[in-house]
Amino acid sequence: MEVNHQNECVPYNCLKNPKIEMLDIEGISSRSREQVAEISLGLTRFLLESLLPGASFGFGLFDIIWGVIGPDQWSLFLTQIEQLIDQRIEAHVRNQAISRLEGLGDSYEVYIESLREWEASPNNESLQQDVRNRFSNTDNALITAIPILREQGFEIPLLTVYVQAANLHLSLLRDAVYFGQRWGLDTATVNNHYNRLINLINTYSDHCAQWFNRGLDNFGVVTARYLDFQREVTISVLDIVALFPNYDIRTYPIQTLSQLTREIYTSPVAEPGASLNVDLRNILREPHLMDFLTRLVIYTGVQGGIYHWAGHEISSRTTGNLSSNIQFPLYGTSANADRPFNLAIHYSETIYRTLSAPIYSVSGGISPNRTRAVEGVRFLTARDNNLNSLPFLYRKEGSLDSFTELPPEDENEPPYIGYSHRLCHARFARSSVVLEPSNFARIPVFSWTHRSAGPTNEVSSSRITQIPWVKAHTLDSGAFVIKGPGFTGGDILTRPNLGTLGALRVTLTGQLPQTYNIRIRYASIANRGGTLIFSQPPSYGLTFPKTMDIDEPLTSRSFARTTLFTPITFTQAQAELNLTIQQGVYIDRIEFIPVNATFEAEYDLERAQEAVNALFTSSNQLGLKTDLTDYHIDQVSNLVDCLSDEFCIDEKRELSEKVKHAKRLSDERNLLQDSNFRGINRQPDRGWRGSTDITIQGGNDVFKENYVTLPGTFDECYPTYLYQKIDESKLKAYTRYQLRGYIEDSQDLEIYLIRYNAKHETVNVPGTGSLWPLSVESPIGKCGEPNRCVPQLEWNSNLDCSCRDGEKCAHHSHHFSLDIDVGCTDLNEDLGVWVIFKIKTQDGHARLGNLEFLEEKPLLGEALARVKRAEKKWRDKRETLQLETNIVYKEAKESVDALFANSQYNRLQADTNIAMIHAADKRVHRIREAYLPELSVIPGVNAGIFEELEGRIFTAFSLYDARNVIKNSDFNNGLSCWNVKGHVDIEEQNNHRSVLVVPEWEAEVSQKVHVCPGRGYILRVTAYKEGYGEGCVTIHEIEDHTDELKFRNCEEDEVYPNNTRTCNAYPADQEGYEGACTSRNRGYDEVYGNTPSLPADYAPIYEENAYTDGRRGNPCESSRGYGDYTPLPAGYETKELEYFPETDTVWPRNRYSVD
């Protein structure tokens, strides 16, 4: 370390001790701007340290601002930005602003005096009345004055006085909330003042941030004045605004430790008044994790005999990580006119001040060479223990003092104690090479951070601690630091997808163990979930309810706080935290609220009150907020249930009634019947319908009320299902509706909303099944109910779900939602909306509850036009379907009627065979929309006529089976009922048909059949002969009366006289069914596709896929009696003979390959 012991103490004329380092500021230009900075930094320090409940804060605010600043000082505030932006404030605007500020100061002084008197005698009703009057007077004065301080056209130059008035107003309202009831105000009035306070925090913050950013944008490019504006207005406006949220006395009821992580720049280190002639566009750093300077290496060059700062290298570390080392690239050049100057900074040291020696040299004649450079800098350091540290000297000390632009925050302390900023980085500007040496410039630019953001994240045991997440020590892959909106005191973090932000290391300062409630300040474009990952297991689930729209800019109103349901107990002095978030979530900071019995009860009450009030659209509780789910209301109810009876029994009862009212409102707007799952299949036409394996279970540690469990299934044709229809009478025309609910866990859960078409999502939500691991017994209450009030191991209630390949994931959280648009309503048609949950895999499962179907919003603009187009398209296709149905129904009915001998459908025609029945069944199944393709138990538009004809087909099968005297004729039951000689096989072919194979000439199967002598019978056989020779099917009686059917490989097919065909005539692709499930008569599936009345070249006149419009056909429709008619292999033929038995017993016998 290079040390120059000469001139170690620099004069600073505001200090009484001449031995203490001092600064001569008498000759400094822009005095007004420096004074504004001093006042603003003093106010910021006061807000950081003294924003405590009670009257002392108001007294202090009066003492440092409103009791000491007069017209001259207010004029300095106005002059500051006038100089920065080169815009003069018109005289009448200036005079009006100053007069208003004076009036506010006078009114506030009277209020403060009455507050002092009341505090001395708080039970004096006269003093209570007086302080109420003084409060109202000052409040009204502020309401009138603040619009004048944002005069149109002068918003930017008025910012510094606007923020002072805004700060005063928030302080005044905070007093009313804190003291209101003791002043004699009723609860409603106090709550009204609180609501005004919260609203004005957002209003004032947004105004200041908006016009600050507008002011920066007006510069266009980065210049020296740009840096001055960024620095000075940050100090005089944004730093104060960043602390506005702490005025929320109910959220921050005790002293709060805040930090300002923003980074500002002092002016380029150059001789005052000299033109820079350098490009400053690369001076600003990109958003980054907060870092702390650990090493500065300065390289020295020489130009025209002047040794100067030619370039430098910087190393830094992140917060709380001594081992981290961020090495930045070389700035400038690594010149070697002198040995490098190496400045190594201990982790306990801070560079709080620089004294630079810039030089502006002009040499030569008519075309002189101009040199702008820095000959030396003294870096003054302080230690964390408030001790002065030896300075670092690079070559020489100069008179350009950083305190001119960044004065101390406390002038009553030595500068190494009262300083306001620490040096964190330096960049470098240089002249263009093409202009050198006539214009030569080498100029460093220093950047600084506020001293409130220290190098460690210490958590207090007695105060609320706010730690911006930009103070993490690592930035995880995929996470980004983005520029803060202006009112957060620094930059913020986000991610474009699900993942972690980065590890934040905290240090506990109190005696261990320490318990804290944890809050996160965030903004979110949708209802999202996240996980707080803790180095002392387990992890904790978080919800991030929507605070803004997707295209909305970040404003103060966009930010909210979310709280862990249970406190965290820290048992170690250091802890690592990380946060898992989803896309569209922006993280500002984490907050630690210390817990003790009394404070915890008060905190829980405040949190419950805030949560209950947030349920409603207004204070009169007439309506619920649309985006608040039924599940959320249950969680708020749990919050109220867990309030302490000892500390707040009356408040608990009042809040409980409000939550019950909210629950009733939630039930009223929910169009689903039996949303609490009192039963399934209880009423034929109402409520929930479902498969018999669904169970209803009472509330657990996830659900407060009943929920349903859907298991997996072994056959996708028989899925687990749950459905309900929303009646047309409940729907409004041209309105969007939303289905939503909560899924504890699921695998392969399909969700459908069906009207004109089907909206379909498959949701996989990992879950533990319980909040409690197997080794831990879930806490229960005295009656066996889940105890939701004990400290719990939390899981992620909004965990990202995983999607099956090729399927779109419905949601990224346990909260799911799906919307559907309704066009014109027609009570006669009663189209309604079908709500379906389905699982069709063996591994599938789901637990879900708090289901809601509710009106979301009227359709406007493009959404309205889109639903009208969809409705017209649906109606056009429905009309086409009706025409096609009429044709198909007529043909199907004719085929069915032809099977029977009479109109009572109780006797078959004598020549009706199994092929004819299957052919008729085929035609019946060409009737589309008999059932919903999404779930075949739900009737479709053509269910009536389909079931009419299908019932007659079933009758035909029954009659046919009843008149067939051969048992097990289709070999579906193997060789049951058959006598076997030799070796035979039963094979199941790929079309699920059982086939008898007789492989050897000596093998045969036979069956004794009882018949009625004198009656005629038909023996009909379908068979195929392999190889040479012949196979026989014989029928004989005991008297050896024998007939036979012979099958030869070389003979041509014999055809039944009335055009009976083998099923080769009907390929399956003509039918439009592609399912794998067979019909109930498996032995006849695909065997008899022939019918005497169906022409071989028949094809449908419509195309089914053209109608579905994204809705797939039901692959399991054949489970209702019709299979996938795959053609038989070539060579099979059907033969028959008539037989008239003379006895009551005959023997059919098969030889060789016979079916």
From Swiss-Prot:
It comes from the Bacteria. GO terms for molecular function: signaling receptor binding; toxin activity. Signal peptide: none annotated. Keywords: Sporulation, Toxin, Virulence. GO terms for biological process: sporulation resulting in formation of a cellular spore; symbiont-mediated killing of host cell. It holds the Pfam family Endotoxin_C. InterPro entries: Cry1Ac-like_dom-VII (IPR048645), Cry_V (IPR041587), Galactose-bd-like_sf (IPR008979), Pest_crys (IPR038979), Pest_crys_Cry1Aa_dom-IV (IPR054544), Pest_crys_dom-III (IPR005638), Pest_crys_dom_I (IPR005639), Pest_crys_N_sf (IPR036716). Toxic segment of the protein is located in the N-terminus. Belongs to the delta endotoxin family. Promotes colloidosmotic lysis by binding to the midgut epithelial cells of insects. This is Pesticidal crystal protein Cry1Hb.
